[in-house]
């Protein structure tokens, strides 16, 4: 089944291909997203004449190719393996996995709505046009809220099911914000006061933001590191901002001077 809206890929486009047959002069590849057969010449697969084509591909392998020529009239497509960079391969494989996953989710949605399964593909194409990666809409529903669907030309019932499926099926990687705390004291028992201030800072953050993992540890006096980790990016941002406010309030109590500087990831 064709996963993409257009019938043929463009020259230079990255495509997902499953190796079907290895021949003397190359490999026949099934383009999974286009429901087409393509050919990869040997010189576009092997990196060196000292190697065999089977050192790079085997029947049944699914990997990323780059389109080098297209003849729609003859329905002939040629692809290259060796022209694909590692970073391109990773991004393309991720997009493909997302397309497959979104299509399955939308097929569930169509079943709930008693609509033809074929509509799922059209909705996926629309979401991809709007977001680049169709899975991003599900991630954004979880990350920032259902309002991301407000401007989409989808009916209300479908939006409700997308929100429901996103909350059930999508688990975002945790957001982590780190910073360096520089804190000093001019008091005779300054070490103990710094320790007490940092303990209270950590305790207060954990009480105010129980859903956020808070860790403070020494880098090398007067530098300490704070790590805040949570599932909701806005909550982690709020906790980091509050950490600076709490530290400022603790300076007078413990007679210390300190600040927090964010570590840019």
Curated annotation (Swiss-Prot):
GO annotation (BP), single: translational initiation
Protein name from the UniProt record: Translation initiation factor 2 subunit alpha
InterPro entries xrefs: NA-bd_OB-fold, S1_domain, S1_IF2_alpha, TIF2_asu_arc, TIF2_asu_C, TIF2_asu_middle_sf, TIF_2_asu
Gene that this sequence comes from: eif2a
Keywords: Initiation factor, Protein biosynthesis, RNA-binding
Lineage, opening ranks: Archaea, Thermoproteota, Thermoprotei, Thermoproteales, Thermoproteaceae
Source organism (scientific name): Pyrobaculum aerophilum (strain ATCC 51768 / DSM 7523 / JCM 9630 / CIP 104966 / NBRC 100827 / IM2)
Subunit structure: Heterotrimer composed of an alpha, a beta and a gamma chain.
Entry similarity comment: Belongs to the eIF-2-alpha family.
A Pfam family that the UniProt record links to this protein: EIF_2_alpha
Residue span(s) of domain S1 motif: 12-82
CDD domains the UniProt entry points to: S1_IF2_alpha (cd04452)
Superkingdom of the organism of origin: Archaea
Its biological purpose: eIF-2 functions in the early steps of protein synthesis by forming a ternary complex with GTP and initiator tRNA.
Molecular function GO terms recorded: ribosome binding; RNA binding; translation initiation factor activity
């Amino acid at each position: 089944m064709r996963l993409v809206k257009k019938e043929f890929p463009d020259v230079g486009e990255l495509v997902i291909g499953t190796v079907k047959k290895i021949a003397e002069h190359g490999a026949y590849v099934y383009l999974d997203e286009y429901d087409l057969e393509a050919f990869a010449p040997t010189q576009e697969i092997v990196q060196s004449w000292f190697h065999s084509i089977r050192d790079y591909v085997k029947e049944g392998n699914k990997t990323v190719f780059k389109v080098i020529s297209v003849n729609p009239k003859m329905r002939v497509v040629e692809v290259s393996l060796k022209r694909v960079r590692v970073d391109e391969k990773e991004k393309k494989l991720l997009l493909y996995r997302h397309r497959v996953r979104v299509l399955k989710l939308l097929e569930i949605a169509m079943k709930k709505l008693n609509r033809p399964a074929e509509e799922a593909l059209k909705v996926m194409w629309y979401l991809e046009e709007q977001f680049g990666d169709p899975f991003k809409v599900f991630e954004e529903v979880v990350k920032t809220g259902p309002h991301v669907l407000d401007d989409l030309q989808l009916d209300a019932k479908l939006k409700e099911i997308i929100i429901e499926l996103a909350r059930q099926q999508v688990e975002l990687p945790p957001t982590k914000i780190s910073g360096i705390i520089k804190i000093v004291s001019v008091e005779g028992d300054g070490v103990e006061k710094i320790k007490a201030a940092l303990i209270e800072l950590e305790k207060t953050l954990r009480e105010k933001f129980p859903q956020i993992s808070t860790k403070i540890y020494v880098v090398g006096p007067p530098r300490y590191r704070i790590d805040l980790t949570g599932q909701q990016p806005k909550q982690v941002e709020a906790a980091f901002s509050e950490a600076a406010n709490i530290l400022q309030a603790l300076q007078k109590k413990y007679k210390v001077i300190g600040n927090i500087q964010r570590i840019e990831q």
